[in-house]
Amino acid sequence: MEQNGRLDVAALQAIDVHVHIEVDLHGHLALPDDQAQAAAKYFGADHRRPTLPEIAAHYRERRIGAVVFTVDTEAYTGHPAISNEEIAEGAAEHPDVLIPFASIDPAKGRAGARAFRRLVEDHGVRGIKFHPSVQDFAPNDRSAYPLLEVAQEFGLPALFHTGQTGIGAGLPGGGGIRLELSNPMLLDHVAVDFPHLTIIMAHPSFPWQDEALAVATHKPNVYIDLSGWSPKYFPPQLVRYANSLLQDKVLFGSDYPLITPDRWLADFAKLEIKPTVRPKILKENAVKVLGLGASPA
């Protein structure tokens, strides 16, 4: 599934743009254990944390490409992040299925932006992931702007968590996590300030689904991934827009390992999506956003 160091897009049935690396090769977790356990309980997941090589094998078996990343929350939680370099190097060992994104805490400022530039230039990183609620920043407060400047310069997408999160769910005070920081309307500001940056709003953005649809409809550089929810629970307005106005701007994402691609795809097959739109969501839109070349007919 790989040609000359790149994904062989024609060999893939789909591209999953939202896959978490939750543990590194040394057993270090991406999040504090109590927050990770809360998320697993929220999703009814089995608490299993596959390693990067295991994820590669899982996706290769299914002929699915996967965008992989961690979430750097070190400044807010004090928990050291999984190495972006390790993820990028691991993805380079599995170029037929894995596409690496970085995650850098916006609190790291210009130093973080320099680190991101090195990851792009020296390690082949293809985008950046943010989780405003867990990283404790508002997307429009400019703290992430040095990182976004680098992403825009290189033409790389920025993936932002939006809506409610399972991380910290049920813990006292929600583990200190503020949901309002993941309101997709905050990304409307970012889309104005970075008109040439590709922005992906992750997840059906409960309780702000209509806001997310409005931003994605109004701003040509804003997309939506469908991760974190089984398609059978998608709000009707999301399905309606995915079938019409946003058919070229909606992307398959699972949120693995919390939701498996098998479960997501099985439920998506039962969703009332137009036959002409289905391949766009599963692969073609991701090919465009990730700069993987023309998708074959």
Segment roles from a protein language model:
Residues 49-60, 81-88, 92, 110-121, ...:
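Amphipathic, non-transmembrane alpha-helical secondary structure
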Residues 25-31, 80-81, 113-114, 170-173, ...:
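Short aromatic-enriched loop/helix-cap "lid" or pocket-rim segments at secondary-structure transitions
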Residues 1-17, 24-61, 65, 246-251, ...:
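Mid-to-C-terminal alpha-helical segments outside catalytic/metal-binding sites
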Residues 19-21, 70-71, 102-106, 129-132, ...:
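A cross-domain feature marking catalytic cores of carbohydrate-active enzymes
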